[in-house]
Curated annotation (Swiss-Prot):
This is Large ribosomal subunit protein uL29. It holds the Pfam family Ribosomal_L29. CDD domains: Ribosomal_L29_HIP. It comes from Latilactobacillus sakei subsp. sakei (strain 23K). It comes from the Bacteria.
Length: 64
């Protein structure tokens, strides 16, 4: 998900997306621990998406 797409979301939608990504990250880490994870790059992508969402939320918080 690109930052441009995240900016267009409402705060509630951003928080929901963040929650979804955190759940996905948990599941990916579990798969990695059990040796079932095939696409290891997905871990990095999910972490970066969480960081992007948190960054946009913080920017909005500071602008208010």
């Amino acid at each position: 998900m690109k930052a441009k797409d995240i900016i267009e979301l409402t705060t509630a939608e951003m928080l929901e997306k963040e929650h979804q990504y955190k759940e996905e990250l948990f599941n990916l880490r579990f798969q990695q621990a059990t040796g079932q994870l095939e696409n290891t790059a997905r871990l990095k992508q999910v972490r970066q998406n969480i960081a992007r969402i948190k960054t946009v939320l913080r920017q909005q918080e500071l602008n208010k």
